Amino acid sequence: FRFERPKSRTQREFWQFGAEVIGESDPAIDAQIIYLGHRILSDLGIREHCELKINTIGSVEDREKYLDALANFYAGKERSLSPTGREKLEQKKYLDLLDPRTEDEEVLAKMAPKITEFLSPDSQEFFDQMLSSLNSFGIEYTIDPTLIRPLQYYSQTTFEFRKKDSREKILVGGRYDGLGKKIGHEKVLGGCGFAAGMERTIALMKE
């Protein structure tokens, strides 16, 4: 069940399937997870109807610098935001503002600073190594600097398989090294995986 208010074309109750790799921090794992998602959608006969978007969101330290930049960017732009957007701004959910609900918010999201401007050398190297591994699989993708995960425990790689000519997400994933400590583990526990909406996948198969 979704806790937050469902957006357009989303449901409160839904089914999903996915895959996870826990305890590994090798960027090649991220590439393998993306390739697994690609293969599943290919075997279901819908990969050609999806486009793969990829980005890096860097380390926790990179994100903190980025959040400061977003706070400065959105300051004074309340009138261009929807009621929901203004609520996000008041709650300092700056990353959520990059998932726009209106045309004005979409324009602002495109103008906003990009996380790639704040990457440390280590984060950039991780992303480069991941892309090198992914390229060996020979699959098509687009690097999208606006692709961000609002959840604070995500880091480094993030990706989405979207329905072409649409913002509808079919399969979404990324790296979440910060999740282990958030739920009580003593140390940082590497993790990477994806989840796909069952209902959206079936609907696309029927088209």
Where in the sequence are the language-model features?
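TRNA-recognition modules of translation machinery and tRNA-sensing kinases, especially anticodon-binding
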Residues: 1-207
